């Protein structure tokens, strides 16, 4: 049954402060990363690092996601808008985050953290990779709740009508409700591409990466699998997702910026998986409790 999107993007209000679902999804993403990371730390999957060290790593990662995601969006998708008004960079509440920018931010943050703790960069990335997909899934759910980044038109029975899409933007909510009830808006149903990405980049990637990383793997393998899966899934979903308005299609009347940015991930993923065939395997080492270490 075709669904009319009517979710209030504001979860609740605390006096004059409005708490948006999108912000709550970010909190859920960081909490899931903390919970999963804690489990891996306690099982010794990043030797030499305890919970204090992991908390430090998570802080670095959070900064990388937020700063990289916002800057990346401005550079990749809204550069002209940014040049016209550079202060828009700080208006994060207006939306606009890029996964590829966030990934670059996380890579830089993890490199700095790994250097600080004298660890191999890819040992850190292999540890971090399984913590990311659930956060990606929560982010895509936030996109769906906010009624943004919708897909192309579809006749599928699970299509979604987005009231803020261009074809309905000039209609009043009451008009939209009445026309939807009469079945007059079915031709405006779109692919819920946000939910496709939540399923593929969130659920499927998490199950595959978490299961794969349960056993000690060769260096580069987990990171390579992450890059390969994300690049492939994102490239596929872009075929049913409307390209960002300021850019549109870049070539062939179908190639999008998201696909161009995903192709290097596929290539990097394949290279890392090939490198892992001759790389050492990082064996788990359980962290030493602080009290025991002090007694020594």
From Swiss-Prot:
The chain crosses the membrane at residues 10-30, 57-77, 92-112, 119-139, 194-214, 220-240, 254-274. InterPro entries: Lgt (IPR001640). A 1,2-diacyl-sn-glycero-3-phospho-(1'-sn-glycerol) binds at residue 140. It is found in: Cell inner membrane. GO terms for biological process: lipoprotein biosynthetic process. Keywords: Cell inner membrane, Cell membrane, Membrane, Transferase, Transmembrane, Transmembrane helix. It comes from the Bacteria. This is Phosphatidylglycerol--prolipoprotein diacylglyceryl transferase. It comes from Xanthomonas axonopodis pv. citri (strain 306). The gene is lgt.
